[in-house]
Amino acid sequence: MSNTDAQTSFASLVVGPPVTDPINPLMGATSISPNLIELHGRKALVFAFGNLAVRAEGDFVLRYRVADILAGTGIDGVFPIQAICYGGPFHVFSTKDFPGYEASTELTKTLSVWGAQVNVREHRRRRRGKKDAAPAVTKPLYTTAPLDRDIVADSERRRRRRAGY
C-alpha cells in the first residue's frame, strides 16, 4: 500500500469518502512556524494555528504536513515533506446552530503564556436564546415623521453591544 493510499484509507475510516471538491474551506494562516513551550515539565514544539477558520458547515479532519524549508530547493514552491499526520474529527456549526464557546483548556492557556497567538476565554460563553435577546424596535419602512432620537440611540447601543464594542 502506497503512502497516498494509506492516507486516503485513514481519511475514509474517519469521515467517509475523501472530499473531492476543489474549493478550499480554510481561511487564515495555513502555514506556520512551531512554538517551543514547556508543558507538564517537558519541552515540546507545538504548531498552534491561532487564526485558522473553516468557512463551511460540516464534519472535517485536518491533515498536517511538516516540511523543512531550509533543506529543500523549493523549486516551483515545493519542499520535501518530512512528516504527515491527521487531527481528530471536528464539527463546524452553522451560525444558527452554534452553541457558544467553551472555556479555554490548560493547553490553550499555556500556549498563550509562551507567546502563541491564541484566543483565551476564562469562562464559557453560551449563545443567547431568543428569550434573552433584546426586543426589536418595530417601525414602518417609510415614514414622514422624524425619528425619535432615543430609539435611534438605543438601537445603536444594542448594535454595538452585539458587535462587541
UniProtKB/Swiss-Prot annotation:
Concerning InterPro entries, the annotation shows: Velvet (IPR021740), Velvet_dom (IPR037525), Velvet_dom_sf (IPR038491)
Q: Which Pfam families match?
A: Velvet
User: GO CC annotation: what is one?
Assistant: nucleus
Keyword entries, A-Z: Nucleus, Sporulation, Transcription, Transcription regulation
Q: What is its main location?
A: nucleus
Q: What does this protein do?
A: Velvet-domain-containing protein that probably acts as a positive regulator of sexual development.
Question: Per its UniProt record, what PANTHER family does this chain match?
Answer: SPORE DEVELOPMENT REGULATOR VOSA (PTHR33572), VELVET COMPLEX SUBUNIT B (PTHR33572:SF3)
Q: What is this protein called?
A: Probable velvet family sexual development regulator CC1G_12219
State the organism of origin: Coprinopsis cinerea (strain Okayama-7 / 130 / ATCC MYA-4618 / FGSC 9003) (Inky cap fungus)
The taxonomic lineage of its organism, from the top, reads: Eukaryota, Fungi, Dikarya, Basidiomycota, Agaricomycotina
